Amino acid sequence: MTKILITEFINQDSLDNLKKYFDIKYDENLYENKLELERIIHNYEGLIIRNKTQVTSDVLKNAKKLKFIGRLGVGLDNIDTETCKNKNIHVQPATGMNADSVAEYVVSSSMSLIKKIPIFHNATVKGEWPRTKIKSTEIKQKLLGIIGFGTIGKKVAEYSTKIGLKILAYDPYVREINDKKIDAKLSNLNEIYEKSEIISIHLPLTDETKNMINKSSFSQMKNKPIIINTSRGSIINEVDLIDAYHKNIISGFALDVFEKEPIESEFYNKIKPDMNCILTPHISGVTIESNVRVSDYIVKKITDFFN
């Protein structure tokens, strides 16, 4: 029977279904032990992971039987895809399965930051009552700039269209928008930086996108935008982001991803209670519903692949 190794959490019903067809080893904490993964990977034809398992060249060197890697999520920066290609190992992300969850996070974070909820909350729990002292605005008719217009970027645009946002989108690989549920215009980075009141980032982490949003980018922002990042932390220069906030170049930010995860004290010590910001531990795409969709999708793909 084909052997499958699962190194991070998966929906239980999906796992039970997988066990009908494969010999499964499931250890949701195995990602923490790189040496153990390197030691045992030679036994398995299939591997199912999330974003914490590092599938490096050292792991793949020992993966003599490996034919399929299922990614319970979207980003592939934790997988040496070039080596996989050379070894003819199929890499399957769960494209689109968590798009609704991420889109909800982006819209809800945008609303919270536009309303300055983090600032109001902090003041209120301290016994203050700044009902008229702090000014907030409505989200309707704000200009949203979406950087990266793939499956998730388009889903964000769909949700944002419904609540009356104006939308600019940038993606060098998208030539036109043919979705009637989306009211958006394709644009360029310069226009997005200059005009947007909210900027949401939906890019893969590559050599091209690493540190892409930096001091130079912030210097072009004229409307004190909200910055939201649910893609990969290293796309934004975190030092430049904090600096832009303190200089009133941006009016707030929501980060679900960070250059180093878990977040380290060097960064979180810079975050003060009175800042208009939201920090979350890489959960924008992780909900009960999305976990079911992602897990079922990868289970179907790996079952189809081997049968």
PLM features: residue spans?
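Rossmann-like dinucleotide/phosphate-binding beta-alpha-beta segment
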Residues: T132-N223
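Residue-level detector of alpha-helix initiation sites
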Residues: Q54, G75-N78, P93, M97, ...
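Structural/interface elements that position substrates and couple domains in central-metabolism enzymes
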Residues: T2-L5, D13, Y21-K25, A99-S101, ...
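Phosphate-binding beta-alpha-beta segment of Rossmann-like dinucleotide-binding domains, i.e.
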Residues: K87-I89, A94-L143, E158-Y159
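Beta-strand-loop-alpha-helix segment that lines the small-molecule cofactor/substrate pocket
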Residues: L60, K64-K67, I79-V91, I201, ...
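An N-terminal-biased, well-structured beta-alpha scaffold segment characteristic
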Residues: M1-Q92, E194, N214
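Rossmann-like dinucleotide-binding domain for NAD(H)/NADP(H)
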Residues: V91, Y105, K215, K224-N307
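Short glycine-/small-residue-rich Rossmann-like dinucleotide-binding loops
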Residues: K52, E197, L203-L205, S231-R232, ...
